[in-house]
From Swiss-Prot:
Protein name stated in the entry: Bifunctional purine biosynthesis protein PurH
Record keyword Methyltransferase present: no
Organism expressing this protein natively: Baumannia cicadellinicola subsp. Homalodisca coagulata
Spans traversing the lipid bilayer: none
One Gene Ontology term of the molecular function aspect: phosphoribosylaminoimidazolecarboxamide formyltransferase activity
Residue ranges occupied by any MGS-like domain in the UniProt entry: 1-148
Record lineage: Bacteria, Pseudomonadati, Pseudomonadota, Gammaproteobacteria, Candidatus Palibaumannia
Record note on domains: The IMP cyclohydrolase activity resides in the N-terminal region.
HAMAP family: PurH
InterPro entries, sorted: AICAR_Tfase_dup_dom_sf (IPR024051), Cytidine_deaminase-like (IPR016193), MGS-like_dom (IPR011607), MGS-like_dom_sf (IPR036914), PurH-like (IPR002695)
Enzyme Commission number, as recorded: 2.1.2.3, 3.5.4.10
Length: 526
């Protein structure tokens, strides 16, 4: 069995100096010799902590404005030396063992993201010596303790105290894994930055989709189970994300979020973010089952719920305004709910919701314009990567192709349900009237079947389809879609267009006196 390592000598070189003085004092108190680079050493000395500067330890000064500090055989030899194997060479060159390496790196990603970023500053924040120290110490984890996270300082000191100055092999291995993960992430960030500098706008595709894709996700939490109870699962955060999203929400109350809760809440939040006026989105199994706008979110919720009360049971509700007391009371009175998500939640609303301890309440914070990013879909043996579908349309993008011009209300409903249909599984059909969905047909292999389901939902909930607007996420391949819409009383259709039978479909619209709008944008969602 591998013996524990007694800490006698430690090298400290940190960019983030949080709690480093406390760690150094604890080590010094236990008789550990401290070696440190210039900036860290200055801080420690000013705190009254005895430390040997690296340049004094090696007999070689820091040079090139600090670019070369720790890249010296006495440092790396002391870290990489194997006990009982390299002892002779150590004695020959008067190299001492370094038992602990505490390093965190220059803040490269933060510098790149800063408003004052320039290329020279970015390059100078590429840490060379620090990554070399971490890799050397992690490679020799059987003989060295490597510490990259300030969150590990206390636990390491506690272990040293409990083990007479020693750190176990298990701990050393876990710390080495963290160090290699940290350097891998760091190198990936550097690669991404230089990749963005190489490619021009004319080769945008190459810039977004490099030959090798390295993206880092950090575990936020383990889940009780995945989509089904026999599947293990966890939730990871995209380290590049700068946008308000389900990943950045704060849970204010309720049980831990499940895998399906997170998936549904993401769909609901992203859909409600499309609307500028007060809106409510209710989602079940990642599909919107009802969406409505209103003068207040209370009115929006009432209109959305009444669209499809059956499907709303056990769903996720999202708002784009602060959740108030009246709306919270209305939700509790009307239905069982898994998750409520809103930018903020009024204190009075929280107090009433606290009586229903199982309801998960999330605060997303106020969001801004969505940030272009990548969308992933894993297939067996590979990964499909595409840009997020963030295309928005407005009144000026609409192309009216029918003889009858849509009314002002029909145009408003068309723009409304076009926002909704983007979030419905294909083939997707949405009926809307007065900026409220009255029927949604999702996920059917036939577009005509999705249209039939949408009309059935409306009829079952006693909602009048006559005079409504219909949105289709993709073009109608045949006129039967328009014929079906006309039978139930649809007066306006919004769709991408682009079928080889567009003229046949336009003719059908004219025969039924339906106003038809082309967007020239498709919104498949598989």
């Amino acid at each position: 069995m591998q013996r524990p390592i007694i800490i006698r000598r430690a090298l400290l070189s940190v960019s983030d100096k949080t709690n480093i003085c406390e760690l150094a004092k604890s080590l010094l108190k236990r008789g550990v010799q401290l070696i440190s680079t210039n900036g860290t050493a200055r801080l420690l000395v000013n705190a009254g902590i005895h430390v040997t500067e690296v340049s004094n330890y090696t007999g070689f000064p820091e040079i090139m404005d600090g670019r070369v500090k720790t890249l010296h055989p006495k440092i790396h030899g002391g870290i990489l030396a194997r006990r009982n194997i390299d002892d002779t060479i150590m004695q020959q060159y008067k190299i001492e063992h370094i038992d602990m390496v505490v390093v965190n790196l220059y803040p490269f990603a933060e510098v790149v993201a800063s408003a004052t970023c320039n290329h020279e500053k970015v390059v100078e924040n590429i840490d060379i010596g620090g990554t070399a120290l971490l890799r050397s110490a992690a490679k020799n984890y059987s003989n060295v303790v490597v510490v990259v996270s300030i969150n590990d300082y206390i636990s390491i000191i506690n272990e040293i105290d409990c083990n007479n100055g020693a750190v176990s092999l298990e701990t050393r291995l876990n710390l080495a894994i963290k160090a290699f993960q940290h350097t891998a992430t760091y190198d990936s960030q550097i690669k991404d930055y230089f990749t963005s500098q190489v490619y021009t706008d004319s080769s945008k595709c190459s810039s977004i989709f490099p030959p090798i894709l390295n993206i880092n996700f950090v575990k936020k939490q383990d889940m009780r189970y995945g989509e089904n109870q026999h599947q293990l699962a966890a939730f990871y955060l995209d380290t590049r994300n700068k946008e308000k999203s389900i990943a950045t929400t704060k849970q204010l109350q309720g049980r831990a979020l499940s895998y399906n809760n997170i998936a549904d809440a993401d769909a609901a939040l992203e859909c409600v973010k499309e609307f500028s006026e007060p809106a409510c989105v209710i989602v079940k199994h990642i599909n919107p089952c009802s969406v409505a706008m209103g003068k207040t979110i209370l009115v929006a919720y009432q209109r959305a719920y009444e669209t499809d009360p059956t499907s709303a049971f056990g769903g996720v509700i999202a708002f784009n305004r602060s959740l108030d007391l009246c709306t919270a009371q209305e939700i509790i009175a009307r239905q069982f709910i898994e998750v409520i998500i809103a930018p903020t939640v009024d204190q009075e609303a929280l107090l009433i919701l606290a009586k229903k301890k199982n309801i998960r309440v999330l605060s997303s914070g106020q969001w801004n314009k969505p940030i272009p990013n990548l969308n992933f879909r894993q297939v067996n043996g590979g990964l499909l990567v595409q840009e997020r579908d963030l295309v928005m349309i407005n009144l000026h993008d609409l192309r009216i192709v029918s003889q009858r011009q849509p009314t002002t209300m029909e145009i408003q409903d068309a723009l409304f349900c076009w926002k909704v249909v983007k979030f419905v599984k294909s083939n997707a059909i949405v009926y809307a009237r007065n900026q409220r969905t009255i029927g949604i047909g999702a996920g059917q292999m036939s577009r005509i079947d999705s249209a039939k389901i949408a009309s059935i939902k409306a009829i079952d909930n006693k909602l009048n389809i006559r005079g409504s607007t219909m949105a289709s996420d993709a073009f109608f391949p045949f006129r039967d879609g328009l014929d079906s819409a006309a039978k139930v009383g649809v007066s306006c259709v919004i769709q991408p267009g682009g079928s080889i039978r567009d003229q046949e479909v336009i003719t059908a619209a004219n025969e039924h006196n339906i106003a038809m709008i082309f967007t020239n944008i498709r919104h498949f969602r598989h």
